[in-house]
């Protein structure tokens, strides 16, 4: 059976196993267990056969509910081999949230682990007659299988299922490869459809920016139900590089793994990198790139990276663009602190005003993205798809600008814009001023309801370790640095900012804190 898809794309793992079967595909950091590409290919063939025996066919939606582990890696490649659509679900969600996502995703089978079995069973239960999936039909029970010995009778054991014969699926670039749910910062999470072409284009453009080679070893310590973690597995098979898998993030263990396994690359959110720098004197010299996304890279963190020669690559991306949109290399990141660099290969970014027209260099507006990494839309939600796209591409909802060097700067979400007394305030601008205070480590700025002005500016600040920071200190710092209407009228101090699993500030939680 040909490994090549009709229009030139390939089964990456099968091809890699044929080209370099003895190359190391995967290392489990906890015990140094290694898999060559031939080993992994054989294991994936068995997993694909077991999924087929449980009824998964080409085009079906395969749900996965587990944290990062070797079994998850096998499921990713097995889904691709079957031509099934991978649907990774966030293992940290509450049962009702999972049930809603399972209904939207129209799953054929949900695969779990021991720790998520109870949640998987709850999410798979038949829904009420007034509850429906994306096509409007009532949702019945979804079969559940576990990669671990199951505790419940309805749950099948994937390991004990006799594999069926599998013929590798022939797929085109326009076929869906995955559905990933957004983090929900704009309301109910939506299922982002990503095609095989999206994934391939993202992998290639990222390789150009990072200089990826088969000799790379990429530490995987992010959750694989987010694109930042999933992309490491998908790309490594294309590059022929090695995944060093750490199940569950621990800052000290991650730093140790980088040194022990000569890791050259790692994907992190800023909080994770900050904790790693706190936990160790120096990161190993083998490290060639630290892809930093999920939240802005603050100046304080960039300063620490420059001082300690950490090759940080601040990146801007989203699920809808299959991860990266723009990425700065270290020299650029240190010289222009706060930028996310230039758009990746094949990616076009246009900054537009409220009417959708392009603005001049240096002017602020919404970032609109076009290119082969951009999703064709949201599964089962044509209304959301239509609303997200315009003549120039995907409207990201992010506010930023392009400088005269072509670099992109991201300020905040468009809907986060505060309108106070008829004046527009961009939270990112205010937060940057707050972070300039020597005793402020981080800050989040939100709009709060105000009877007189419609909204007022609120700020939650995190002091530096050991610093004593008062509300008055913050207010005095803003005088002369911000126009009166931009200054925070409500200020709170906290040890940390509330964040989602992907590192994004939970703005509603900030508002709740400031309202108390």
Predicted feature locations:
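Conserved pre-ATP/AMP-binding loop-to-beta segment of ANL
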Residues: 4-6, 21-24, 129, 162-181, ...
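Conserved AMP-binding/adenylate-forming core of the ANL superfamily
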Residues: 5, 22-56, 60, 65-69, ...
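Conserved AMP-binding A3 loop
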Residues: 34-38, 170, 175-204, 506
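AMP-binding/adenylate-forming catalytic core of the ANL superfamily
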Residues: 93, 371, 376-377, 387, ...
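ANL superfamily adenylate-forming
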Residues: 115-174, 188
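Conserved AMP-binding/adenylation subdomain of ANL enzymes
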Residues: 200-217, 224-265, 275-280
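Gly/Ser/Thr-rich phosphate-binding loop
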Residues: 238, 263-268, 272-335, 348, ...
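Conserved ATP/PPi-binding loop(s) of AMP-dependent carboxylate-activating enzymes
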Residues: 342-346, 357-388, 425, 432
């Amino acid at each position: 059976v040909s490994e090549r898809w009709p229009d030139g794309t390939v089964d990456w793992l099968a091809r890699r196993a044929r080209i370099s079967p003895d190359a190391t595909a995967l290392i489990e950091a906890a015990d140094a267990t290694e898999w060559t590409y031939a080993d992994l290919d054989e294991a994936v063939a068995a997993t694909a056969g077991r999924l087929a025996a449980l009824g998964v066919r080409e085009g079906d939606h395969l749900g996965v509910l587990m944290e990062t582990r070797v079994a998850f890696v096998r499921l990713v490649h097995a889904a691709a081999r079957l031509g099934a659509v991978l649907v990774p679900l966030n293992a940290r969600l509450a049962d009702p949230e999972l049930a809603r996502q399972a209904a939207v995703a129209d799953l054929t089978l949900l695969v779990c682990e021991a720790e998520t079995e109870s949640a998987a069973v709850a999410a798979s239960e038949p829904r009420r007659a007034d509850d429906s999936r994306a096509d409007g039909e009532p949702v019945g029970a979804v079969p559940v299988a576990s990669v671990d010995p199951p505790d419940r009778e309805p749950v099948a054991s994937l390991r004990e299922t006799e594999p069926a014969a599998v013929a590798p699926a022939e797929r085109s670039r326009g076929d869906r490869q995955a559905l990933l749910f957004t983090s929900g910062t704009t309301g109910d999470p939506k299922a982002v459809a990503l095609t095989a072409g999206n994934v391939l284009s993202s992998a290639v453009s990222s390789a150009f920016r990072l200089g990826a080679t088969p000799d790379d070893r990429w530490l995987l310590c992010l959750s694989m139900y987010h694109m930042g973690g999933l992309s490491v597995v998908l790309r490594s098979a294309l590059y022929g590089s090695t995944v060093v898998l750490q199940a569950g993030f621990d800052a000290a263990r991650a730093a140790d793994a980088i040194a022990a396994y000569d890791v050259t690359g790692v994907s992190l959110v800023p909080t994770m990198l900050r904790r790693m720098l706190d936990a160790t004197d120096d990161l190993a010299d083998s490290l060639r790139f630290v892809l930093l996304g999920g939240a802005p890279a603050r100046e304080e963190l960039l300063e620490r990276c420059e001082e300690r020669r950490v090759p940080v690559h601040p990146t801007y991306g989203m699920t809808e663009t299959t991860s990266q949109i723009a990425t700065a290399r270290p020299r650029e990141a240190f010289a222009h602190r706060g930028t996310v660099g230039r758009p990746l290969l094949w990616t076009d970014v246009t900054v537009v005003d409220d009417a959708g027209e392009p603005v001049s260099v240096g002017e602020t507006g919404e970032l609109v993205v076009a290119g082969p990494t951009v999703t064709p839309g949201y599964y089962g939600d044509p209304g959301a798809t239509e609303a997200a796209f315009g003549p120039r591409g995907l409207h990201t909802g992010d506010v930023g600008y392009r400088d005269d060097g072509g670099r992109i700067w991201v300020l905040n979400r468009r809907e986060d814009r505060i309108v106070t007394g008829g004046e527009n305030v961009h939270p990112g601008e205010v937060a940057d001023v707050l972070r300039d205070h020597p005793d402020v480590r981080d800050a989040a700025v939100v709009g709060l309801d105000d009877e007189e002005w419609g909204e007022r500016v609120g700020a939650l600040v995190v002091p530096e370790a050991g610093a004593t920071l008062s509300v008055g200190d913050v207010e005095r710092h803003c005088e002369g640095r911000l126009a009166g209407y931009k200054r925070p009228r409500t200020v709170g101090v906290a040890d940390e900012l509330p964040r989602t699993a992907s590192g994004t500030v939970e703005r509603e939680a900030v508002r709740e804190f400031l309202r108390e």
